[in-house]
Amino acid sequence: MAIGNLDWTQRGGALTLTERWGLTLAAIRKHVNLRRQARPDGASRLANTLDRLGLRALDQIEHPWDALAFAASTAAQELQPQWLTHHCWRTYAWGTLLAVNADLKYDKSLFFSACMLHDLGLTSHAAAPNDHCFTLRGARAAGDILRSAGASETQAHCVAQAITLHLNLDVGVEQGVEAHLVQAGAGLDVVGQRSQEVPALLRQAVVDKHPRLSFKHQFCSCMQNESRNTPQSRTGLYVRRLGFLDLVRQAPFDE
């Protein structure tokens, strides 16, 4: 059973010893990659589609206006603090730009909905036990919101699984392109993962439109609280053992 998928999270998101070791080794590899990415010679990266498009790439970030997207964005605005909702918008922007670079095809409405609601479990509006992983709490709440807006079970499952998977260190496209992009977008915004793939001009434009509002401080506080409540979860491992909060603070953003 894959870590982070919906079936796996039904046990509350607690890691087995084997899973903890596997994630620890993966985190070490990820940390090495982030350090390499931060080196000055990273500026000499190969040109990509976003370089060629320049600011025109921002046109791709236009969000969908169907019933599911409207329900997700409305819920995000009403149920989340502003700093967290801006993070959700940036997650969507980064994921969209990375998809342009990789020429990935996906369901834009479901991807957008998952981005808007992927951290809903960090708020008090996610109805599930506090000792369960916040991604499970958020996935359940998101499913209810989208079903109320007319989502099919297949659509609700896609969004919910993208939410529970996004806390993994990597999500392959074979696990769902939408899930892959949510994790990629959130990873870029939180720790700077793959930020070198997005030209500085585009990064600044996204942050100007959706300001960070002391994101690092706010997010680290949430993660510390989550790790105390769910010490056996992925968050508990990342925060207590793997230096996750330091990676957040070192991300290539001012706040």
Feature locations, PLM:
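Divalent metal-dependent catalytic cores for phosphoryl transfer on phosphate-bearing substrates
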Residues: 110-209
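Short coil-to-beta-strand
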Residues: 61-68, 106-116
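Active-site flanking loop/helix segments enriched in acidic
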Residues: 57, 68-87, 92-96, 121-126
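Short linear elements at protein peripheries
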Residues: 48, 52, 56-72
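Divalent metal-dependent phosphate-bond-processing catalytic cores, especially two-metal-ion Mg2+/Mn2+ enzymes
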Residues: 1-54, 81-89, 93-104, 151, ...
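Generic alpha-helical secondary structure signal
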Residues: 66-70, 74, 82, 153-157, ...
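Short pre-active-site segment immediately N-terminal to the catalytic Zn-binding motif
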Residues: 100-108, 126-127
